[in-house]
């Protein structure tokens, strides 16, 4: 009940006792109404003099960017800019998805004019743009101890970016590379490490590259060529459609898809390539290609804000604007599930000269472990497995390299086995 309601109830009791005392002509009953009348009068005077506390809120964070699952230290400073506050209670309003790991989010104190109080706590945040909206402030009146509550807005935002797993080696061979030196084999002769071919000696060739064994056989000067290594254009494509990212309870395939996108982007940027990010879901979120740490920060910020969506216009991959991607470049796509229409679109991309790596997070083992054994479960598992084999076979026929990632294991070790030079030779 609000303070005015309480005072009204007390006045009603006092008036009722007074009327009853007059009717029964009993002074004791009439006198019993006096304490209630005095309390109600004092409360009314106290309410008329009560003012909202004049306080300011300052919040300090140990970092404005963290990796999901890490902790962040928060310090809240409350300063009294008005008259003395005898009793003041402050409680931080913490959203449900943030986990408090240590410290206190509330405090109680008496504040003189110009004084301040401080409390600190530590929280853990999942991936995304997170905000602390403000604090709930409670004061009590001096005489009646009636509480007055108000919310003081003071929003502080921070970003929890996805985990980027370190990857050792990925061998890509796009049809087109840039002119600058890098680590991607360009399928062109020149200066490099790996042997590429030979040609007849011409004026200006480096004599240290003359193949003397060939000269001994042919009596003609033959020069060795080595394969050039350059940087490449790489686009990380994150499929954020609802139907492509199934969930199992609180576990979401999309969480692992975002981590895979961050890991792949980090690797290719570290190798000096030009990397862009395209998120296909609620809308087309395009991060223009770039280089270096600043580009990695932009990509992580976009991935931190990424969410799944179910929009009819983006139901399949036909709406993908391929003109955004550099011609005949490398595409790294991450999707939890594909259908026949998606495979058809990927075939068109391959026909246009794009090299495609498809990473598919797989939570099937986790899901099967949560379902009790039955004939229905075994039949459903068989159907899902057969359908997946059909999709994977169709992708292999059009030349898409598929990495089927069981999320219970490490992505880095799987990529090192399937996409590295050594792994491909052994395969």
Annotate each PLM feature.
Residues 297-304, 359-361, 368-394:
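Acidic, Ser/Thr-rich peripheral helices and adjacent loops at domain boundaries
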Residues 383-426:
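C-terminal helix of von Willebrand factor
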Residues 281-284, 361-366, 408:
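Short beta-alpha junction loops
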């Amino acid at each position: 009940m609000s303070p005015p309601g309480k005072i009204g109830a007390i006045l009603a009791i006092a008036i009722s006792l007074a009327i009853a005392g007059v009717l029964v002509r009993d002074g004791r009953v009439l006198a019993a109404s006096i304490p209630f009348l005095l309390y109600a009068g004092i409360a009314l005077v106290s309410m008329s003099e009560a003012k909202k506390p004049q306080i300011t809120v300052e919040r300090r964070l140990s970092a404005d960017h963290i990796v999901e699952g890490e902790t962040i230290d928060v310090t809240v400073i409350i300063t009294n800019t008005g008259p003395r506050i005898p009793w003041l209670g402050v409680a931080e309003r913490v959203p449900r998805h943030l986990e408090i790991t240590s410290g206190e989010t509330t405090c109680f104190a008496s504040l003189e004019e110009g004084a301040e109080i401080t409390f600190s706590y530590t929280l853990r945040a999942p991936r995304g743009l997170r905000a602390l909206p403000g604090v709930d402030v409670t004061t009590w009146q001096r005489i009646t101890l009636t509480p007055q509550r108000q919310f003081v807005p003071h929003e502080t935002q921070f970003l929890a970016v996805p985990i980027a797993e370190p990857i050792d080696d990925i061998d890509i061979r796009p049809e087109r590379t840039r002119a600058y030196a890098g680590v991607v084999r360009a399928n062109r002769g020149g200066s490099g490490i790996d042997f590429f071919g030979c040609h007849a000696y011409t004026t200006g060739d480096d004599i240290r590259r003359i193949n003397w064994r060939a000269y001994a056989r042919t009596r003609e000067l033959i020069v060795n060529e080595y394969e050039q290594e350059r940087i490449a254009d790489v686009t990380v494509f994150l499929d954020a459609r609802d139907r492509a990212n199934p969930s199992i309870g609180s576990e979401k395939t999309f969480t692992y898809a975002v981590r895979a996108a961050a890991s792949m982007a980090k690797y290719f940027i570290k190798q000096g390539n030009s990397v862009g990010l395209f998120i296909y879901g609620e809308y087309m979120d395009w991060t223009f290609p770039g280089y270096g740490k600043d580009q990695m920060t932009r990509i992580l910020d976009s991935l931190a804000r990424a969410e799944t969506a179910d929009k009819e216009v983006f139901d399949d991959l036909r709406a993908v604007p391929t003109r955004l991607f550099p011609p005949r470049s490398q595409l790294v796509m991450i999707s939890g599930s594909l259908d026949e229409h998606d495979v058809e679109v990927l075939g068109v991309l391959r026909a246009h000269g794009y090299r495609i790596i498809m990473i598919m997070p797989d939570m099937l083992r986790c899901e099967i472990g949560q379902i009790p054994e039955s004939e229905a479960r075994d039949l459903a598992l068989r159907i899902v497995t057969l359908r997946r084999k059909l999709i994977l076979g169709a992708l292999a026929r059009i030349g898409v390299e598929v990495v089927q990632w069981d999320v219970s294991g490490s992505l880095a070790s799987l990529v090192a086995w399937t996409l590295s030079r050594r792994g491909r030779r052994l395969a």
